[in-house]
Amino acid sequence: MSEQQFEPACRRMEWLDPFYKAVWEKAYADAIPISGTFELTPRCNFNCRMCYVHLPENEIKKHGTELTGAEWIRIAQEAKDAGTTWLCITGGEPLMHPEFETIWRELTQMGFFITLQTNASLLTEYEKLFEECPPRACKITLYGSNDQVYRDVCRVENGFTKADAGIRMLRQMKIPVELVSTVIQQNLDDVENIIRYVEKNKLRWIPNINVRTAGRGVDVDMEHLRIRPPKKDSNAEQESSRKNLVDPERKPCTYCKD
């Protein structure tokens, strides 16, 4: 493939079932918006150090506005009419939208394949809703293996306890769960415990070390969040380099070819 040629996502999704892969290929060929993401709200009950989306309620109007339930439902209908099948519902924390239940019921009745992206801490409050209108899958952010790590990373109380309760509820409902973790300095030492939690619950897990700068003035202290690579031992590096340059088994003339 030439550098100028665009490769659609469907051709990079080797993991897709052949039927769904064919659907995505057809959608690409016919310019159908087969999938989409609805960021319902920048509200969140967590205050994660590295978040570039969350805004407190008094800041929302400074950066635009929060769409109403009716507006989201109208957009969803337009997306459906255009051919959208897969939807990711996210935030902020999407369950914090004042009309979340109304939006969710309407979207599920439209027939979308919905993935809910959430911190899981509020899921148990909507147990009846998700029993009646279950998502196709849930992608959950997991920031630690105990409440203390959540206190350090998300600056909330009982964060892990609530998230774990939400995860257990979804598993009891047989709803597929995928965990995603952003690793920063404040939870780096807990990664092994997170892995043990993932293995114990037999869940898929995607770790991530990328911390992004917000484009709308959200205060994120990158210097004290990003994981720094370990410093190299310059003496050891020089010694290794010297050994690679001088090999007693090589003939002197061969060095001219390097």
Task: For the regions a language model picked out, list residue spans one by one.
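Radical SAM enzyme [4Fe-4S]-AdoMet core and its adjacent flexible, acidic
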Residues: M1, R136, T141-Y143, D147-D258
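Conserved alpha-helical substructure of the radical SAM core
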Residues: S2-K128, E132-R136
